Every structure is written in structure tokens, then in C-alpha cells.
Amino acid sequence: GRGIEPFFISSYNLPTHPQIYVLSNVRKDGKPIGRDGAGTHWHSDSTFTEKPSSVTLLHGVVVPARGGDTLFADTADAYERLDPSTKALIDGKRAIHRYQRKEFVFSGDRAVDEAERAEIERLKALRLAEEAATAPSPTAQRSNREPDRLHPLVRTHPVTGRKALYLNDEMTVGIEGMPDAEAVPLLHRLCEVATEPDRVLRFKWRQGDIVAWDNAATVHTATFTPPDEPRVMHRLTVEGTVPV
């Protein structure tokens, strides 16, 4: 069987159990105990690797009273809802996946109001200023250093054989053989189709919850967590295969 894989930036992994990746806005002695602000865009995990994670398991260790929900969308359903001309356009195409630093960007929740959006921008400015005054974060150090990966834009599920869109709203940066002026709007449109609000499942965490999902058939995003609401999540991912 496939094994558990550690997150590729070891600074964010639990020292006693390095396969566990820590996501948290909590700080100890002024330093973050995990990665803060990650995953607030629609994505499937580790698409910038040769063999992206097949399954993700997330454990709610400390759950905020406000924010920090996880939203899910079904990318197989999204593909099936596309019109025939769009399917013909994207079938057989390969998308370009690039690891980029994408922290404190926005909430993947389209329902965010202007007050919360302003709060997100304030937190983003604060975190970037903190980093500028110290050393670059491990994430920033790795930004754009990973090689680009080409994966099918329409992926066939390795178990069910069902076709699904395979994209990452921030790290899928283009389509092989297609001008960016055409590819980028197309990618954003496909993500919008997949994440139409009435097609999204919202999971509200309770302490101790564990959720597992299939990265070959879904995309997910975290919603914004206010900085005064502590959040600690432990993540495990299972090794995957080369997407086809």
C-alpha cells in the first residue's frame, strides 16, 4: 500500500512525528508553531509535485469559534457539467502547476463581506511586515524554486475511472501549448464552475474532528480565521500516483 508522506518543508512538521504537518495561527515565544495562512484558495493538495497526494486527513486540534471552516467542491461533477465544446477544448490538455508562495492572500469563500476582506488585508500586511523585519519564512524561501509540473487538466480517477477537472486556483498557472491570454481566463472559469456556491459543501469544525478527502476528485479551501481565534490543525497526506 501507499505510505504517509511528510510535508516537503520540514520546518512546519511536528518534531516528534515528522509526517504530521502543522497548520496554525498560534505563536509561541513570538514564533509560529505551524504554517499560518495556508490553503485559503481553491486547490487539490500538492499538485506541484510529480505524484500529488492521493488522500488528505485533517485533524482539528484547536478549533476557532469563528472562521476556519473548510469548503469542498466535487471536480468530477464539475467536469460532467461542462458543455461539449469546453470538454473538447480541455480534454487531452496538460496544465502547468507551479509552486508559489500563496499565504495571507484571500478567503476562498465567495461569501466574504467587505469588513472581513479588510481584516484579511490588514493581517496580510502585518505578516508581511513581520517577515520583512526578520528572515524569509520557509515557504517564501521555497517560492518558485520547485520545478514546474505538467498534469492532465482532465484527470482520470485511478480507482473509479471517472473524469474530473484537476486544477489549483493559484498554482495552476497555464496550459501547455496555449497562450496565457487564453489559458489563464479559462483556468479561472473552470475553477468558478467547480466552486459555484450552491455546489460547495461547508464543513464547520469541532475539536477532535478528523476529515479525509480524495484529492483526485475534489478541491478544497480554508476560510479566513481571525487572528484572535486560535486554530491548530494536524495534517497527514497519503502518497499518490502520477496523474493520467
Residue map of PLM features:
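Non-heme Fe(II) oxygenase catalytic core, chiefly the N-lobe of the double-stranded beta-helix
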Residues: 1-210, 215-244
